[in-house]
A protein has these predicted regions:
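N-terminal Rossmann NAD(P)H-binding glycine-rich loop of SDR-like oxidoreductase domains
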Residues: 7-27
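NAD(P)H-binding glycine-rich loop region in Rossmannoid oxidoreductase-like domains
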Residues: 58-97
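NAD(P)-cofactor binding segment of oxidoreductase domains
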Residues: 70, 89-116
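Conserved Rossmann-fold NAD(P)-dependent oxidoreductase catalytic core, especially the SDR/UDP-sugar
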Residues: 78, 103-146
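A conserved pocket-lining segment of Rossmann-fold NAD(P)-dependent short-chain dehydrogenase/reductase
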Residues: 88, 140, 169-180, 192-214, ...
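Conserved beta-loop-beta element that borders a ligand/cofactor-binding pocket
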Residues: 120-121, 155-180
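Glycine/proline-rich active-site loop of Rossmann-fold NAD(P)-dependent oxidoreductases
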Residues: 152, 165, 178-191, 216-217, ...
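C-terminal substrate-binding subdomain of Rossmann-fold SDR/epimerase-dehydratase oxidoreductases
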Residues: 201, 206-209, 213-309
Length: 309
């Protein structure tokens, strides 16, 4: 980190965004959060630092460009997006936010010498891409949801902005992120189970099988590292991480909170491959340290208990 670094985190009030702001503030970096909403409960859950927040709509490209200049931004971590439950009632606006918003970020970066780290998603793939082994980093996906198609389009836009405008970018494809602040989206059920256990309640995780579970603070650190990495081109990487079964997750929660019952709906399997090859990202960023599952579950339950106290 240099003294001149100043970060803008879009989607700052989401789970990964809140953790990204918190970790940047913790290390003394200058960070500004940007979000359409005003509910800062996730940010307050993960940090006591006073993070400057700007409310705005990522769809307004001119306002976003002014924001970069007003705050002297040197790095953008673009996490703002609408998830599937928010897209389905209004697909045109969801598309404007997810694709148009990313275009606005890249367009604003092109004349300001800013590298962009942005969130893609494992949702750019589907069961059609399940090859019975880890999906390779350069495999072409066949998404089956609005969200997945949006994210695939964002990757394409980043490639065009590099080819035509030389805007460098790194896209990261998270899969199932868990931890404090993860309370929204199709794959939030493991964290919901931890929240239930923290309250002393039983819970049934809504899907089963094996998957890559990515601890939210670890995920945020990857985005920060990606924003700082010297790169040329429009690179995109699977986030990777350890593969675990949802029954292992349930057992880890029960080990932290004896007496609660955490079960798993093994009849429901998410329509995505279970593993993505994270080795290329690990190599590009010089190694990623993953928090062990039991440690991540314990820390999550502890923090959620503290909030209830």
């Amino acid at each position: 980190m240099t003294a001149k670094e100043r970060y803008l985190v879009t989607g700052a009030l989401g789970c990964i965004g809140a953790w990204t702001c918190a970790l940047l503030a913790e290390e003394g970096a200058e960070v500004v959060g940007f979000d359409f909403g005003t509910d800062d409960r996730r940010l307050r859950l993960v940090t006591h630092a006073e993070i400057p927040l700007v409310q705005g709509d990522i769809v307004d490209g001119k306002a976003f460009a002014r924001l970069l200049d007003e705050h002297g931004i040197t790095h953008v971590i673009h996490l703002a997006a609408l998830l599937l439950p928010q897209i389905k009632p209004d697909p045109p606006y969801g598309t404007a936010v997810n694709i148009g918003g990313t275009v606005n970020v890249l367009d604003a970066a092109k004349t300001r010498g800013i590298q962009v780290a942005y969130a893609s998603s494992a949702a750019v793939y589907s069961t059609a891409d399940d090859v019975g082994a880890a999906v390779s980093n350069d495999a072409i996906g066949h998404p089956t949801t609005f969200y997945g198609v949006h994210k695939q389009a964002c990757e394409g836009m980043a490639r065009i902005f590099w080819a035509e405008e030389q805007v460098p970018s790194i896209g990261i494809r998270p899969w199932i992120v868990y931890g404090p602040g993860r309370d929204n989206g199709l794959t939030a059920s493991p964290t919901h189970a931890m929240a239930a256990a923290a309250a002393g309640d039983d819970y049934r995780i809504t899907f089963g099988g094996r998957t890559q579970l990515q601890y939210a603070p670890d995920t945020a650190r990857v985005f920060i590292a990606a924003a700082r990495a010297a790169t040329e081109g429009a690179r995109v990487f699977h986030l990777g991480g350890p593969v675990v079964s949802l029954t292992e997750v349930a057992a880890a929660i029960e080990a932290v909170v004896p007496g609660v019952s955490i079960t798993v709906d093994e009849d429901t399997i998410l329509p995505f491959p279970e593993e993505f090859d994270g080795a290329p990202l690990d190599e590009a960023l010089g190694g990623i340290a993953w928090t062990p599952l039991q440690e991540g579950v314990s820390a999550t339950v502890e923090r959620l208990r503290a909030v209830r106290a």
